[in-house]
From Swiss-Prot:
Its EC number is 3.1.-.-. It holds the Pfam family RuvX. NCBIfam families: RNAse_H_YqgF. GO terms for biological process: rRNA 5'-end processing. Disulfide bonds: none annotated. PANTHER family: POLYNUCLEOTIDYL TRANSFERASE, RIBONUCLEASE H-LIKE SUPERFAMILY PROTEIN (PTHR33317:SF4). This is Putative pre-16S rRNA nuclease. Could be a nuclease involved in processing of the 5'-end of pre-16S rRNA. GO terms for molecular function: nuclease activity. InterPro entries: RNaseH-like_sf (IPR012337), YqgF (IPR005227), YqgF/RNaseH-like_dom (IPR006641), YqgF/RNaseH-like_dom_sf (IPR037027).
Length: 143
């Protein structure tokens, strides 16, 4: 059975998006919004939710390197609550948090090694990070 899964890499000004039907993760896009205007960012997410009709939303959860919950993870929790308030057809059981430590750094390194310009690196960094988060989730299901 195929599943429709969307991954989110939530930042203060962007949401990186990736998609999978349950096998291969693909980066989709990056939603950009005014800093900390998560309402604006989440409203832009609606067209992707309609198009891909996901049953699971995988969210990168940025724990601190010592495995504690810091400001960034609290910000993600806040955005998840906003998401659930805005999109009533989803429930908290459909939201899966994946430890995303270092995924943005790995995404940056991949883009640097691909010899992309700084402008293109900035354009693709967040959606690639979302793809890496989604790949971590897909791998965890195989264990």
């Amino acid at each position: 059975m195929t599943q429709s899964i969307i991954a989110l890499d939530i930042g203060s000004k962007t949401i990186g998006l990736a998609y999978s039907s349950g096998v291969i993760a693909s980066s989709l896009d990056t939603i950009r919004f005014e800093e900390y205007n998560f309402d604006q960012g989440l409203r832009q997410l609606e067209s992707y939710l309609k198009k891909y009709n996901p049953t699971i939303i995988v969210v990168g959860y940025p724990k601190n390197m010592n495995n504690t919950i810091g400001e960034r993870a609290e910000m993600v929790d806040y955005v998840i609550e906003m998401f659930l308030d805005m999109y009533k057809n989803f429930n908290k059981d459909q939201i899966i948090r994946i430890d995303e430590r270092r995924t943005t750094k790995i995404a940056k390194n991949i883009l640097i090694q691909a010899n992309l310009t700084r402008e293109k690196q900035k354009k693709y960094k967040d959606s690639l990070a979302a793809q890496l988060i989604l790949e971590l989730y897909l791998e965890s299901r195989k264990l």
